[in-house]
């Protein structure tokens, strides 16, 4: 019996917004990952199973073939580097933006103009480094894994680089968005070997995802 395809997803917004794309392929995940303790979830298609992993680990599972394909944010893929992955489709889900934010009242533009060296907290170190280097801004980057908004409030950093959707969390912590680095959305990523060896099995899912992401439905 042929082993089922494995799709790597992370909990939360990406999982929720991938569900309609799976529906477009005629597939339903059998269990809700927010309620189930299982990390391998069957689907209504015996040829597909879903594994639930951390968002930052999706590219690694796909690159090394533990998953045949997955859904990951552009932010995660940029930090990962994209090696061993084929990225055929921007799914246009989990949309937000990566931005620089500072405490309200901090004159970011003037600090940059004066050539000040800024401490910036972020989990997107590589992307932030490239952004500031391209703009000639001098920074010391501090790697954090969460609660980014806290860093400027306690004097750890002058600014943060983080994902922003509505901006509500920034506002609640008296921070303001001063610069958008790039728009972010989630992409379908496919293991390159799987694309060659399992193309026939993958193709219906890739086609359905592409149609659904473009608003074509099933």
From Swiss-Prot:
Catalytic activity: 1-(5-phospho-beta-D-ribosyl)-ATP + diphosphate = 5-phospho-alpha-D-ribose 1-diphosphate + ATP
Transmembrane segments: none
Signal sequence bounds: none
GO biological-process terms attached to the record: L-histidine biosynthetic process
Enzyme Commission designation: 2.4.2.17
Pathway as given in its UniProt record: Amino-acid biosynthesis; L-histidine biosynthesis; L-histidine from 5-phospho-alpha-D-ribose 1-diphosphate: step 1/9
The entry's keywords: Amino-acid biosynthesis, ATP-binding, Cytoplasm, Glycosyltransferase, Histidine biosynthesis, Nucleotide-binding, Transferase
Subcellular location per the Swiss-Prot or TrEMBL entry: Cytoplasm
GO terms assigned for molecular function: ATP binding; ATP phosphoribosyltransferase activity
InterPro entries: ATP_PRibTrfase_cat (IPR013820), ATP_PRibTrfase_CS (IPR018198), ATP_PRibTrfase_HisG (IPR001348), ATP_PRibTrfase_HisG_short (IPR024893)
Keyword hit for Membrane: no
Matching Pfam families: HisG
Subunit note: Heteromultimer composed of HisG and HisZ subunits.
Recorded family membership: Belongs to the ATP phosphoribosyltransferase family. Short subfamily.
Biological function: Catalyzes the condensation of ATP and 5-phosphoribose 1-diphosphate to form N'-(5'-phosphoribosyl)-ATP (PR-ATP). Has a crucial role in the pathway because the rate of histidine biosynthesis seems to be controlled primarily by regulation of HisG enzymatic activity.
PANTHER family: ATP PHOSPHORIBOSYLTRANSFERASE, ATP PHOSPHORIBOSYLTRANSFERASE ATP-PRTASE
Domain notes: Lacks the C-terminal regulatory region which is replaced by HisZ.
Protein's recorded name: ATP phosphoribosyltransferase
Organism for this UniProt entry: Burkholderia thailandensis (strain ATCC 700388 / DSM 13276 / CCUG 48851 / CIP 106301 / E264)
Gene: hisG
């Amino acid at each position: 019996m042929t082993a089922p395809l494995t799709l790597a997803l992370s909990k939360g917004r990406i999982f929720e917004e991938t569900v309609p794309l799976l529906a477009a392929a005629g597939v339903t995940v059998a269990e809700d990952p927010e309620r189930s303790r299982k990390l391998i979830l069957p689907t209504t298609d015996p040829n597909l199973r879903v594994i639930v992993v951390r968002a930052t680990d999706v590219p690694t599972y796909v690159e090394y073939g533990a998953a045949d394909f997955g859904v990951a944010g552009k932010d995660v893929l940029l930090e990962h580097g994209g090696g061993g992955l084929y990225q055929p489709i921007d799914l246009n889900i989990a949309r937000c933006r990566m931005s620089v934010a500072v405490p309200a009242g901090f004159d970011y533009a003037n600090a940059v103009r004066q050539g000040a060296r800024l401490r910036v907290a972020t989990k997107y170190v590589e992307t932030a480094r490239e952004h500031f280097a391209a703009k000639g801004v001098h920074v010391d980057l501090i790697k954090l894994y969460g609660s980014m908004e806290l860093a400027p409030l306690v004097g750890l950093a002058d600014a943060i680089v983080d994902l922003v959707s509505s901006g509500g969390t920034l506002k609640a912590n008296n921070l303001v968005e001063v610069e958008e680095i790039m728009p972010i959305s989630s992409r379908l990523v496919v293991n390159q070997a799987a694309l060659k060896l399992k193309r026939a099995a993958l193709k219906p899912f890739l086609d359905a995802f592409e149609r659904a992401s473009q608003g074509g439905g099933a």
